[in-house]
Structure formats: C-alpha cells, structure tokens
C-alpha cells in the first residue's frame, strides 16, 4: 500500500495526501485501497500523460483542417437498403443462417441513467408510454425471442452481453430478475461493467477528489467498450460459445433491430471485419456525426469539422455526398476483436470534456460545487478504431431512419428525441407492417405490434382484411 502512495506522489499528486495525518487509520487504508484499484489498471503517470495528450489533441482538432481529405465511402464499402428489397432478402437469409448456427452474439451498451428523462432508473428500464407499458429492455428482449423462434428448429439461444456502469449495474440486474429475464434464459445474458477514469483539474496535471478517500471518477465513454471487452474476457467467452459475429447497439433506440440478420448478412456477404449502420442526413446542416473517409481511411467526422461547402456538396444523383449519419450500431467479426483488441486499448486517443465537477479540496478541507467548468473528464469514442481497419474490410449500410432510428435522449415535452417521438415511431412502424400485410387501419389509428409477434413485419398474414378502428390495441403472440 505504501508503494501506491509513493506512486501517486512521484506522479506529482502529493495533494491527495495533504490531510494524511488527520485521517483515521481506516480512512487511510480506504484511500490507498481506492487509489490502488485505479493504479492497478493504469499508472497515475500514464493517466496524467493521457490527459495532457488529450488536451493537445483537442487543440489540434479545434478548427477545420484544410490539410485533410474528407470523402464519402467508396461504393465497395457503402450500400443503401432504401428501395433495395432484393439485396435485403439475400442478406436476411445469410444473417438468419448465421444465427441458426449459433454464431451471433449481441452487445448492448446500457450504462446510462435516465436522469435527463426524469428517472433515477437505468435508461433501459424506461417506459416510453406504449399501450403495453413495456420498457426498452423488454422490447429488445422480445426481439431476441422472436429471432430465436424463427430458427427454433436449431434450438439457438442468442448470447446477450449487457454493458452497465457502476451506478446502474445492481438496478439493471435486479430489473431483469424481477421480470424473469423477459422470457429469455438467464444463462444467455451476461452483465459486465463499463470502466471509469479519474477526473482532472483544468490544467490536466492534478486529479480531483470526490471526498477525503476517493478520487472523482466518471465513465470512460462508449469507446471504453473495448477495454471492458478485454477486462471481462468476452473474447474468451465468444470462443467458448463458438461466436463468430457480434452485433452492438445502444439501449436508447427503440427501433434498434437487435442481432439484425440483414446487417449481419451484409457483413458476411462482403467479408467485412467491421461494419456500421447509417441513416441519411435530413439536410446538409443536420448536426450529426458522419461516416466517411479521412485520407482514405474510414472514420466518423463531427459536423463541426467540415466546411459549409463540403456539407452542401451533392453527387451526380443530387444526393448529399456526405450523408451517412452515424447511429452507433456496429458489426464486429470476432477474429478482428481477437487480432486488434489489445492495440485498440493501448492506442485509442482520449477526448476531453470540460465539466462542472463537485470536488473536495484536500488542502482546505472544503467541498466545492462549481457553477463554471472546473475540471476535465476523459472519454474515448467507439469509432476511433475505424481507421485501423482496411477500407476493403469496412462496410457501411444505409438504413431507413423511419424503420431503424428513433433515439431517446431528452425528457417528456422536449423539442425532439423524447419519449413521445420514440413512442410514435414505434407505433407507426408496427401499424405500417399491418397495412403491408393487408390489414385495414383507419386514419389516425396506431396499433402496437409486439416484438415477440413480428421482428420486421413478418408473421402478420392472419390480420389480412382485419379492420383496426381504434388506437391502444396491443397485438401479442
């Protein structure tokens, strides 16, 4: 333990021990134990170096770089499903075949709390107000059940790896237990935690303290998924289960097509090692990350990084050249994860976020609740590994926004991306499936179609000719 203390002092963090003599023996041990947990993963000197590098990286990327060549993905890497039902059917068959062989697993990023939604629960527990009152977790679980039903002769259980965070882990597990895992086998679900990183002062040279025995810490961003996969030995679990393909998505999109056979089939057909879904930008100036190439390497660029001229540029078909909006929905070949995971964890850059961080001042012994940003939180971005994948092994599939993307970011009554927009998108999609199946739906009527009944509009022929003349109906299996 004394080695831990020395490690932090040598890294210039003697302020952490300013009140050492006034701490009780128990508090001294607790402080050292907490510091050792942090330093066992990354030395304090390395963390401080990472923060300094992130500050430099931020300064270097704070303006539009005219020396960088930004282009759309080439046709060999980019394909649209819009108006392309023949290809969609082909990919569906390929993906469903892989699911039937037990080769597909799903990773869900579900570490967020529903704070902005006015809820203290994990975001996945949130009820968007459907007639069925189903939560996001239940909707997603039932999509897996439906897929398993479609290959039931194979007796497949799709492994579901759910990444939580320190604040949401216990509540998430309890929620699944209370609901009997929504009909899934408990053994096919694995919970694991996202990592955390210490917070720094604005100079990036000192750690901030939460209280006399703890550093202030925060989640390490969606890019922390890779280190979490490594530290929780998921690759070894993929091997044990015979998994070859991994589908990754975020909890807050009610339209997510979990373990999407079409997307998986797209990657298999073209031999892609990493693939991502995109939705078409609504207009040239929609503030959304764009999937593109930077100096002929795949990447995601922020809207703020490109000039107005480039944002508005159109191709020969009159479409925006840069139109592939990022929805953080990925495919990974397990062989890629085995090969590159270590180097990703070692080499991925950190990004800084200046935040108002409640802190304890060990010199004065006082707590501060700042009204202005007083510190730096570090985070990693999941797409920062894209440029390590050869362009011919990287794919992007454009999907229909109305069918696949309705994020839940903001609370009830807000301008967009709220429970109302999510609920409407979900009900409209199910209702459109019924109409496609030959049902007669009166104007203004919306029907909820359970994910257990239909995954993507199939299995609804029994409603042909049936009249739906009121909203609030839930069609269950």
Swiss-Prot record:
It catalyses: N-acetyl-alpha-D-glucosamine 1-phosphate + UTP + H(+) = UDP-N-acetyl-alpha-D-glucosamine + diphosphate. Keywords: Cytoplasm, Nucleotidyltransferase, Phosphoprotein, Transferase. A motif (Substrate binding) lies at residues 109-112, 302-303. Substrate binds at residues 222, 409. Changing residue 123 to A: Loss of activity. UTP binds at residues 109-112, 123, 194, 221, 252, 377. It is found in: Cytoplasm. Belongs to the UDPGP type 1 family. This is UDP-N-acetylglucosamine pyrophosphorylase. It comes from Saccharomyces cerevisiae (strain ATCC 204508 / S288c) (Baker's yeast).
